[in-house]
Amino acid sequence: VENLLPIGNKGKSNGMQMPTFANAGSLDALAGYITLLADRLQVEDTLLAQEGVKYRTFPAVKIGLLAVDRRTKGLGVRLMEWAIDYVIAEVMPLVGVRFITVDALYDSDVEPAYDASGFYEKLGFEFADPTEPLPPVNPYRTMYLDLKPLIEVLATEQTG
């Protein structure tokens, strides 16, 4: 990750944020990018019933695309950290969102099968529907990250 250089924030003119990185040795070779877009998290049960919230649909920010060059160890985590920080600092003060969502790819057409959900689980994401079947019915599984615990930790660190 040390040899990566930010090469811009593509798409700012249309409101989409997309930080991009290139390898320091070759600025014309894209090392990774991430996109964010508006979404909603729909759940079968009331996700926040213990907090007295009875909704089944919640506004969210979706990780639309996340791509990294396999040679750039740690860039995927770095881009996700940027996205989480950006949503907390820039989006949440303006829009009522509490969740980040992603459709984690499960690709059974490659050997061995590729399951991106483990990457997102390490970052604290949970399955919106843990009983959702894997492919061939559906190659993506919706996952979410509740930002409230992160915000509470940040608030505690700032006051303590």
Q: Which ranges hold each PLM region?
A:
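Non-catalytic substrate-recognition and accessory regions of acyl/acetyltransferase enzymes
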Residues: 1-73, 77-160
